[in-house]
Amino acid sequence: MDVKKVNLFSNSKIRKINPDWFTAKVHMAEISDVIGSKEQNIYHVYFENGAKTKLHVHDGNQILIVTRGNGVLETFSKRGRGKENFGIRRTKKIALNLGDVAYIKKGTLHTHGSADKKRLFSHIAINILPPKNKKYSTTWYESDFKTLAGNIIK
C-alpha cells in the first residue's frame, strides 16, 4: 500500500518509555510504526501537570508540532569537555503554543514540555533518522536545568 494514515486522537499504540527521561508523568503514542515510516520516528507525546523532558541531545534533527496547551523549549550550551557532569548555560527559552512548529538541530542540548502545571500539553515529535546508522539515538542527563548536567541516564 502506498498510503497509510492514522488519526492522532484515536487509540494509537502506546510506546513504553523510561520514566527517568521525564520530570513527571508523560505518555507517548507511536505513529511511525503504525504508518510504516522508515525515514523518521514519529510520536504524539502528552505531558501532564508541568512535566517536561530531562536534559537531552539527539544525533538526528527533531521537529516538534504543538497539538495542545502551552509548552516551553529551552536550549543550553555545554561548558567543559566531559561526556557527563559538565556545566550548562541556558541559551534560549522559547514559548510553544498550539500550532507552533519548532526545529531542533542535531547535537542541540535541550529540554521541552509543559509550561502549565494544571493543563495537559502535547506535541508531535518527528525524529529524523541519521542517514548513516539508521538508528536515532538520544542521550539523557540528570540536571538542575540551571548550571549542571550530571550523569547520563541509562
Question: Can you name each region flagged by the protein language model?
Answer:
Residues 1-40, 54, 93, 138-154:
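A short, N-terminal "cap"/entry segment at the start of jelly-roll beta-barrel domains
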Residues 41-58, 106:
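Conserved short histidine dyad/triad with adjacent acidic residue
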Residues 44, 57, 75-77, 114, ...:
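Residue-level recognition of conserved beta-strand positions in structured domain cores
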Residues 51-54, 72, 98-102, 106-112:
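Histidine-centered metal-chelating micro-motifs
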Residues 59-83:
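Glycine- and acidic-residue-biased ligand/ion/polar-headgroup-sensing regions
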Residues 63, 103, 118-139:
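A short hydrophobic beta-strand segment most commonly corresponding to one strand
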Residues 78-107:
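Short acidic-glycine-tyrosine-enriched beta hairpin
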